[in-house]
């Protein structure tokens, strides 16, 4: 399994709301992520500036690149757009992170 990480940006004043929305994540979104080959997905928040650090594993042959085409993914992005930095299509702005250290 490949592990990837990326950074997103939350409005720092919306930390509690971001966590609440993820505590109530839609079952159909969870299913779409798993069906795309994603597992062990965690998001960490830096409360000082709203930086989000996400890390996940994806299986070989994953379908992660097809997620933006799924209606549930687009609905989730719209639901989160009021509290995050987003692209014109409401997807969160995300910057890939390069691993610089790993302790197996």
Swiss-Prot record:
Its EC number is 5.1.3.32. It is found in: Cytoplasm. The keyword Heme does not apply. It catalyses: alpha-L-rhamnose = beta-L-rhamnose. GO terms for molecular function: L-rhamnose mutarotase activity. The active site is at residue 22. One of its GO terms (biological process) is rhamnose catabolic process. It is an enzyme of class 5 (isomerase). Pathway: Carbohydrate metabolism; L-rhamnose metabolism. The keyword Cytoplasm applies. Gene3D superfamilies: 3.30.70.100. Its main location: cytoplasm. Substrate binds at residues 18, 41, 76-77. Keywords: Carbohydrate metabolism, Cytoplasm, Isomerase, Rhamnose metabolism. One of its GO terms (cellular component) is cytoplasm. Involved in the anomeric conversion of L-rhamnose. Homodimer. NCBIfam families: YiiL_rotase (TIGR02625). Belongs to the rhamnose mutarotase family. This is L-rhamnose mutarotase. It comes from Acidiphilium cryptum (strain JF-5). The gene is rhaM.
């Amino acid at each position: 399994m490949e592990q990837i990480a990326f950074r997103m940006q939350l409005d720092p004043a919306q930390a509690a709301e971001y966590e609440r929305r993820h505590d109530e994540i839609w079952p159909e979104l969870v299913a779409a992520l798993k069906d795309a080959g994603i597992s062990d997905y965690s998001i960490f928040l830096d409360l000082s500036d709203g930086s989000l650090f996400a890390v996940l594993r994806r299986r070989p042959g994953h379908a992660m690149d097809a997620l933006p085409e799924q209606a549930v993914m687009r609905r989730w992005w719209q639901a989160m757009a009021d509290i995050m930095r987003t692209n014109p299509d409401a997807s969160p702005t995300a910057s890939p992170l390069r691993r610089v250290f790993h302790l197996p």
